[in-house]
């Protein structure tokens, strides 16, 4: 599997868990990507649940490191 395929697979899982989630992807290398997910508070755990094991599986089976960070899109910006 390619990194692009893995990112698409994870994005599809995220969108299935929360259609309103916004996903921003940064490719760090040919084998590593970071997905920043902005979702409502009520959907954050659901997204974590549907992406955790697949991310581990991609790392173990394909050597692809897909990191998924989930943020509350309704939280006020940090001060300081």
Per-region residue spans from a language model:
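Residue-level signal for secondary-structure boundary sites
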Residues: 43-45, 76
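Short edge beta-strands and adjacent turn/loop segments
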Residues: 15-35
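A short amphipathic beta-strand at an alpha->beta junction
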Residues: 60-80
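Short amphipathic alpha-helix segments
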Residues: 2-17
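Short, non-transmembrane amphipathic alpha-helical segments
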Residues: 10-14, 45-64
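Short beta-strand-to-loop capping motifs
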Residues: 37-41
